[in-house]
């Protein structure tokens, strides 16, 4: 079932839900996190082999010495409301969004 909504000006709009962030493209800038009111994604550390180590909270992370870089990771996809704010601010276009009827449970 596809959900369509009508905006105030009468045009239709269909939510596109965040399902993934490309770890090879993401630069970990955090812009998407800042505009997301639902805390769908968080900053994670990644090592040189590409393994995601865990969430970075800015405190004393156990793996701080192992970090090669940081990336955004979808931690709570079910919280996404499909507004697309994260996609609009992403400088690398590294996110995948899909309509509700395309999401496999």
Curated annotation (Swiss-Prot):
This is Putative ferredoxin-3. Pfam families: Fer4_7 (PF12838). Residues 17-46, 70-100 form the 4Fe-4S ferredoxin-type domain. It comes from Sinorhizobium fredii (strain NBRC 101917 / NGR234). Keywords: 4Fe-4S, Electron transport, Iron, Iron-sulfur, Metal-binding, Nitrogen fixation, Plasmid, Repeat, Transport. The keyword Metal-binding applies. The gene is fdxB. One of its GO terms (biological process) is nitrogen fixation. One of its GO terms (molecular function) is metal ion binding. It comes from the Bacteria. [4Fe-4S] cluster 1 binds at residues 26, 29, 32, 36. Ferredoxins are iron-sulfur proteins that transfer electrons in a wide variety of metabolic reactions. Binds 2 [4Fe-4S] clusters.
């Amino acid at each position: 079932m596809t959900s369509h909504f009508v905006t105030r000006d009468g045009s239709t709009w269909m939510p596109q839900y965040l399902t993934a962030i490309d770890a090879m493209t993401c630069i970990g800038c955090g812009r998407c996190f800042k505009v997301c009111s639902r805390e769908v994604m968080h900053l994670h550390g990644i090592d040189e082999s590409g393994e995601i180590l865990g969430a970075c909270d800015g405190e004393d992370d156990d793996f701080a010495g192992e970090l090669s870089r940081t990336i955004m990771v979808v931690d709570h996809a079910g919280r996404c409301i499909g507004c697309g704010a994260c996609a609009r601010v992403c400088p690398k276009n590294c996110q995948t969004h899909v309509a509700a009827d395309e999401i496999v449970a």
